[in-house]
Each structure stands twice: as structure tokens, then as C-alpha cells.
Regions:
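Catalytic Tyr-X3-Lys loop
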Residues: 90, 97-117, 159
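Residue(s) in the substrate-gating loop at a strand-loop-helix junction
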Residues: 139
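C-terminal helical subdomain
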Residues: 179, 194-229
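Conserved NAD(P)H cofactor-binding loop of Rossmann-fold oxidoreductase domains
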Residues: 85-93
Length: 242
């Protein structure tokens, strides 16, 4: 199967998206559209791609907190790309979210509810009957609610369940759904995580390139499957300390 020639990236200014775009270009991707909250953060990526590869890059500013996809008809710009990537995410202020409804809703909005207009349009009836792929970054946090990050985990769990439904809907379609349950990644969002548990965003990108047309749910790195199995089955008294 021919490699992706075009990619539509939501969360284009994230470190993970940065390295995925570079690795896509290395493998022959020629056209990119970056959706980001702050377009200035895309400058380094755009400069690198244009200097090293013959690519076409467009971008648009969109804040997932404001749901601009519906307000300014941004979803009409989605078009037909070979790969759609959702790499956006917001951990938020975990302590504040326990008592502040605004921060709690901010976490749920950015990580799930305001992604829905995009995902629904990406997987419209016409598009899923053609070849293409949707990669969605979820999180191992979605596997069990824990005191340390249950708002973030709940939002990612909702995203995972929704996309799992899409995965099954597209089971016999040429369009593939790939749900990535990522563990700790060495990015600003994962700055407080133990370093020995972190994987670099470049390694994440290289791993995804090994099987670009893969369908299904996967843990990244793979050993998080074992870790989260243990987390899911431990008694509540122990889980309350996580």
C-alpha cells in the first residue's frame, strides 16, 4: 500500500506531532495541514520541513477550548487527506480541577467534547468508504480512574470509547482507525513523570511508522499493557494511593 501523501494534524504544535510530521515527510508525505492554538509554535517545524523536504504546508488557528470548528466552519476545510492525526491534549491543573468546575470542564472540553465535530466530519459516510487513516492519541490514564488525574483520565476514556465505536464501524471499510494509548512521553505535558517511564516523542513517531496502516487499540510503549492490567485489577484501597 502506498504511504500517506497528505496529513491533517490537530494539535500541530505538540512535540509528538512535530516528530510525526518529520517522519512522515521522510517517508514521502508531501502535504500537511496543521491545526493549532498558537501558530507561532509551528514556525520551527515549518522551517525544517520546507528546508529539508519538498512539501506543501498550510495551517489554521483553532483553540479547542472555544469550539471554533463549529463557529467558523473550520470543519469544512478538512477535505480528503490520507492521514488524520489527533495529537492534542491538555492535562490541566489536576488539584484545581477537583474543586473548580471551570478547570474541570476545560480538561474535558479540550480532550474530548470539542474534538467531536472534527472526528465526526473526518469519519463522514463518504470518507470512510475510501482509503485513509485516523490516528487518535488517547492515554493509559483512560484505563482506570485514579485520584491523581481522574478528570484527564475520564476525558480520555470518553475519547477512547467513542473512537472504539468508530473502529468497529469501520471494521470492513477501507478507512482505518488507530487508537494509541500512550504512556508518559518526554514533553512539557509529561514533565513531572519519572524519567525512566518516559519515551521520547521521536521514538513514538518512529514506532508508529513501522506499521502505518495498523488498525485497533495499542499501548505505547507496549509494556504499558501489562502495567495497566495490574493497575486495573488492584484493590481500591491500593488504587486510591495512585
Amino acid at each position: 500500500m502506498e504511504f500517506f501523501k497528505s496529513a491533517f494534524i490537530i494539535g500541530g504544535s505538540s512535540k509528538v506531532a512535530y516528530y510525526i510530521c518529520i517522519n512522515l515527510a521522510k517517508n514521502g508525505c508531501e502535504r500537511f495541514h496543521l491545526v493549532s492554538r498558537d501558530l507561532n509554535r509551528n514556525k520551527d517545524l515549518i522551517k525544517y520541513l520546507k528546508n529539508n523536504y519538498k512539501v506543501i504546508i498550510t495551517q489554521e488557528e483553532n483553540d479547542l477550548l472555544l469550539n471554533n470548528a463549529l463557529k467558523n466552519n473550520s470543519i469544512s476545510k478538512i477535505g480528503s487527506y490520507d492521514l488524520y492525526l489527533i495529537a492534542s491534549g491538555y492535562l490541566g491543573d489536576i488539584d484545581l480541577a477537583q474543586y473548580d468546575a471551570y478547570e474541570a470542564l476545560r480538561i474535558h472540553t479540550i480532550n474530548y467534547s470539542n474534538l467531536l465535530p472534527w472526528i465526526i466530519e473526518i469519519t463522514n459516510k463518504k470518507r470512510v468508504n475510501k482509503k485513509g487513516s485516523l490516528w487518535v492519541f488517547s492515554s493509559v490514564a483512560s484505563d482506570r480512574g485514579r485520584p491523581s488525574n481522574y478528570h484527564y483520565g475520564a476525558a480520555k476514556a470518553a475519547l477512547t470509547t467513542f473512537c472504539e465505536g468508530l473502529l468497529l464501524r469501520c471494521e470492513n471499510k477501507p478507512f482505518s482507525i488507530r487508537i494509541i494509548k500512550a504512556g508518559y512521553i518526554d514533553t512539557p505535558m509529561g514533565k513531572d513523570a519519572p524519567s525512566f517511564l518516559c519515551i521520547s516523542p521521536n521514538r513514538v513517531a518512529k514506532y508508529l511508522m513501522r506499521r502505518p496502516f495498523k488498525r485497533g487499540i495499542e499501548y505505547l510503549p507496549w509494556w504499558w499493557l501489562i502495567v495497566m492490567f495490574i493497575v486495573r485489577i488492584i484493590p481500591a484501597k491500593l488504587a486510591s494511593k495512585l
